[in-house]
Amino acid sequence: MFAEGRIPLWLVATIAGLGVIAVLGLFFYGAYAGLGSSM
């Protein structure tokens, strides 16, 4: 948090949110693909 005054909080929150969505998306996509291939 050394650049707390220079980096807008909304930008940090947006990047963090996109990262979480990307990880969850890949996780659910992998689970869905694995489930589909196993059936």
Swiss-Prot record:
UniProt keyword list: Membrane, Photosynthesis, Photosystem II, Reaction center, Thylakoid, Transmembrane, Transmembrane helix
Listed under GO cellular component are:
photosystem II reaction center; plasma membrane-derived thylakoid membrane
Q: Which GO terms describe its biological process?
A: photosynthesis
Q: Which residues cross the membrane?
A: 7-27
Question: Per its UniProt record, what Pfam families does this chain match?
Answer: PsbJ
Compartments annotated for it: namely:
Cellular thylakoid membrane
Q: Give the way it sits in the membrane.
A: Single-pass membrane protein
Keyword Membrane recorded: yes
The record's section on HAMAP family has: PSII_PsbJ
Q: Which NCBIfam families match?
A: PRK02565.1
Q: What does this protein do?
A: One of the components of the core complex of photosystem II (PSII). PSII is a light-driven water:plastoquinone oxidoreductase that uses light energy to abstract electrons from H(2)O, generating O(2) and a proton gradient subsequently used for ATP formation. It consists of a core antenna complex that captures photons, and an electron transfer chain that converts photonic excitation into a charge separation.
Q: How does it assemble?
A: PSII is composed of 1 copy each of membrane proteins PsbA, PsbB, PsbC, PsbD, PsbE, PsbF, PsbH, PsbI, PsbJ, PsbK, PsbL, PsbM, PsbT, PsbX, PsbY, PsbZ, Psb30/Ycf12, peripheral proteins PsbO, CyanoQ (PsbQ), PsbU, PsbV and a large number of cofactors. It forms dimeric complexes.
- PANTHER family with a match to the protein in the record: PHOTOSYSTEM II REACTION CENTER PROTEIN J (PTHR34812:SF3)
For this chain, the family text in UniProt reads: Belongs to the PsbJ family.
Name of the protein in question: Photosystem II reaction center protein J
